[in-house]
């Protein structure tokens, strides 16, 4: 800006290309071999890939974003081994996939580097009962969280099941408990604390004590001070993307 004599730069890492580029082919193999192939196609160097050993016989990705293809492959593995995965940049210019929630190594405590902490919980997305119906709208099964109903009251949804399908798994995914989140700020900054990893926080006033999952991170340098601001989650959730069946 000419008036303020301040130059502002906006920089993207190479995940920009993963998020905005399409792929158009049928992939096969393990996620840890599929993802480097995607990176090679886009001219991006690949880094460490979380090992799964899960073989995917066919994964059609016609006109899909590269990010979606990566998550489809690792979602297939997650269904078998129960792990959570996330792609991110490592060593400045390499796309890697790691097990989401891996401890970053940083610890934030009130007597050392923690300068601010907030905590909140909300019932806005609460769902603790799902009624599964047939095509004629008859209830054929109920999936519920009895403890949540007793504690918070009943919020239910209706899910229609298609012929020949079992909607139980989908109904379980629709259950949502109280959502808790927190934000913390710390000085000095620690570059190990980035989204996708987890961190240890020890702050007794808010009750933030234990391992939390970093959902977003901001690292600021101003007036000789390096500060990190983190948004934390209490659950380790993965951005799941299903492989679509071809007809």
Where are these regions (language model features)?
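Sec-exported extracytoplasmic/periplasmic mature domains
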Residues: 39-44, 75-79, 201
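Acidic, small/polar-enriched beta strand-loop surface segments
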Residues: 71, 83-222, 234-240, 247
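Flexible, active-site-adjacent loop/turn segments at secondary-structure boundaries
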Residues: 16, 25, 57, 124, ...
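Surface-exposed cap/loop segments at beta↔alpha junctions
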Residues: 1-50
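Intrinsically disordered, low-complexity terminal/linker regions enriched in Pro/Ser/Gly
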Residues: 40-48, 54, 239-247
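Solvent-exposed, acidic/flexible segments
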Residues: 24-32, 62-70, 192
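Short, solvent-exposed secondary-structure boundary/capping segments
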Residues: 1-13, 220-233
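Short beta-strand-centered interaction patches in the first periplasmic/extracellular domains
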Residues: 6-18, 48-118
């Amino acid at each position: 800006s000419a008036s303020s004599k301040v130059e502002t730069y906006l920089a993207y890492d190479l995940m920009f290309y993963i998020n905005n580029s399409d792929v158009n082919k049928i992939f096969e193999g393990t996620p840890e071999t599929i993802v480097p192939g995607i990176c090679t196609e886009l001219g991006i160097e690949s880094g460490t890939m979380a090992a799964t050993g899960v073989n995917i016989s066919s994964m059609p990705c016609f006109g899909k974003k590269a990010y979606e293809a990566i998550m489809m492959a690792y979602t297939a593995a997650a269904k078998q081994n129960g792990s959570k995965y996330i792609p991110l940049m490592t060593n400045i210019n390499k796309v890697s996939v790691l097990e989401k929630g891996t401890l970053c190594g940083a610890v934030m405590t009130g007597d050392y580097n923690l300068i601010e902490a907030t905590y909140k919980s909300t019932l806005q997305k609460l769902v603790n009962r799902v009624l599964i119906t047939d095509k004629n709208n008859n209830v054929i099964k109920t999936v519920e969280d009895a403890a949540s109903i007793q504690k918070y009251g009943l919020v239910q949804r209706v899910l229609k099941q298609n012929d020949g399908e079992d909607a139980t798994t989908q109904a379980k995914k629709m259950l949502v408990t109280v959502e808790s989140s927190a934000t913390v700020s710390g000085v000095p900054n620690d570059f190990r604390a980035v989204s996708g990893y987890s961190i240890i926080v020890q702050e007794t006033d808010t009750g933030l004590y234990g391992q939390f999952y970093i959902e977003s991170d901001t690292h600021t340098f101003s007036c000789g001070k390096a500060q990190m601001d983190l948004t934390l989650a209490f659950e380790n959730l993965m951005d799941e993307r299903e492989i679509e069946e071809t007809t």
